[in-house]
Design a protein with these regions (language model features):
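A short, conserved alpha-helix in the catalytic core of glycosyltransferases
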Residues: 127, 137-154, 158-159
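Active-site proximal beta-strand in glycosyltransferases
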Residues: 269-286, 303-305, 325
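Short beta-strand->alpha-helix junction loop in the catalytic core
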Residues: 284, 310-311, 327-337
Length: 351
């Protein structure tokens, strides 16, 4: 057995700062299979902890927090340090970002405004006592996690990928069991027009009662905007063509596919039971390279909208029969404002 960090974890580790948390006594409660976890815990910088498979006998008065682990996983050497530090700030429920897949190529970034029922979370002693009382003495780790998620009063998200699940990410990792689910598909998360405009959809969907998850290739600038707006973000380099992650869409109540580049995903969902909004921003130039992936006809579940007449005409150049509505994003009309004239000659040197 060995531990290997994902590319994201290695990148983050180089920037992490050590915090002395050795006075905080923690339990790691993992009643199920925990071979990989046990190996990873050997390398923890925070040493004042104990791995247990039975909770009640180990809950002494000195225990300040318990890491609830419902399945085998690996963690970075700094994981318990970060969890202990979060407890010191007054948090009663602490979660973190995570890597998924054998090589950790899928990354999950959580938002404090959207916390699904986690498979692993740190719970303060005070919250744990309340949760165990509500669980009526049953120390089922999944039940404790479910109740802790619902009863937490001061939830804290650590913006570090401290955990690594060797399996692939699934819908239960990003959505709660009984919430309305919205999945946003974006072929890029850069600071360019389409992704930036897309962030405006997140608060709108949240106001309609949706839990929002964004799927994109990598953090290229706009990822923090989606997190701040209240969405969880899943990144994978081949997200546009990875059918396993499209499986998230089949468990969603609504899918927003951003730009024509998501044609392959729309084609897969075409005619299914999942409502799809295909939002077009694209000009003519890209269509010769993507036209062969665009469905010939669209099922009743797919609705196409564009940001204006140019984007509409671009799609009609290859699919003239598509019905396309207008969904215009609102931006300030700076052309109507009065700006003082700028004369570059004023700044030329006398020399």
């Amino acid at each position: 057995m060995y531990s290997s960090y994902s590319t994201l974890q290695r990148k983050q580790l180089t920037k992490q700062v050590y915090t002395d948390t050795q006075s905080t006594y923690l339990l790691v409660y993992a009643p199920g299979r925990h071979q990989a976890l046990e190996h990873a815990l050997e390398n923890q910088l925070h040493r004042k902890f104990r791995l247990v498979t039975e909770l009640a006998p180990a809950l002494t008065d000195s225990v300040e927090g318990v890491l609830l682990v419902s399945e085998d996983l690996e963690c970075t050497s700094t994981a318990l340090t970060y969890f202990a530090a979060a407890l010191r700030t007054g948090a009663d429920f602490v979660v973190c970002d995570a890597a998924f897949g054998f090589d950790g190529s899928t990354a999950l970034y959580l938002s404090t405004q959207h916390i699904p029922c986690s498979r692993c979370a740190m719970v303060s002693r005070k919250l744990l006592d309340r949760v165990r009382a509500a669980a009526r003495g049953r120390d089922s780790v999944t039940e404790l996690l479910r109740l802790a998620t619902a009863m937490a009063e001061n939830c804290h998200r650590i913006p570090q990928s401290l955990l690594h699940f060797r399996r692939e990410l699934c819908a239960d990792d990003v959505f709660s069991a009984d919430g309305k689910r919205a999945l946003i598909l974006s072929h890029e998360l850069t600071m360019t027009g389409a992704p930036i405009v897309l962030t405006s959809a997140v608060p709108v969907l949240r106001s309609m009662g949706f839990e929002v998850v964004v799927l994109g290739p990598a953090d290229d600038g706009s990822l923090p905007l989606f997190l701040d707006a209240g969405a969880a973000v899943v990144t994978r380099s081949d997200c546009v063509m990875n059918s396993s992650l499209w499986g998230l869409a089949t468990s969603a109540d609504f899918v927003l596919a951003n730009t024509v580049v998501e044609a392959a995903a729309v084609s897969t969902l075409n005619g299914s039971f999942v409502p799809v909004l295909w939002w077009l921003h694209d000009a003519f130039a890209g269509y010769p390279f993507i036209a062969h992936k665009i469905p010939k006809t669209l099922g009743s579940n797919v609705h196409v909208c564009a940001v204006g007449s140019h984007a509409t005409a671009a799609m009609h150049s290859v699919r003239p029969d598509f019905s396309i509505e207008q969904l215009i994003y609102g931006l300030p009309d700076y052309a109507q404002e009065s700006f003082p004239p700028y004369d570059c000659l004023l700044y030329t040197s006398d020399a």
